[in-house]
Amino acid sequence: MINEQYEVAQYLEGKNVNKKCLHRICFLLAKYYKEKGMNHLEIRSEIFGWGRQYNIYFPFSVNSVIYQALEDKHPLRGETQVYISDSDVAQILARFDSKNCKILALAILCYAKVAANSDGEVAISTVAFANWLKMQQSHISGRYIPELIDFDFMEKLGDEETYFMWDKKTLSKNRRYKLKVPLVNEGTYVLSDNDIFTLASEVF
């Protein structure tokens, strides 16, 4: 989620591939091949070659995802230093008791420090966060995020953006949120290789 280059390297080796996250995975792979200078057809060929290698079927338009990746202006994030301070930890502990709420809040805070705009607004995919944090997506969207909102950690903005598979089943959902805690990338603790669990064990 934070280090997208590391994430892509894992996917290319067939690791941590969650079929519920295929839309995001395909998008990141398309960006990866775009940055290698490939054209539309070459990107498509590489993605389907990867899919055949790991027996993965794409239940959506890969070409549409390729267009999205080609239009995206942001390069894949590499090893970005994300710092957590004692003040950050205090903000979380002042609001939450449950382990999963604290981990989700920490993960969203880390993600927002590198992905939020100048107003502290960031788009969050509950499917992608569920895969990263090894939590049930329904628990994140139905229980944990409402608690984060109720206790003034963040606020919900606008409508949800939903992507569907060919059979109309939900593929992924994104919604924008505004963090209501300070977003200052400073502190003693560091997130490395997207390992939120090691970071959580250090700060909580």
Give the role of each language-model region:
Residues 169-204:
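Short, amphipathic alpha-helical interaction segments positioned at domain boundaries
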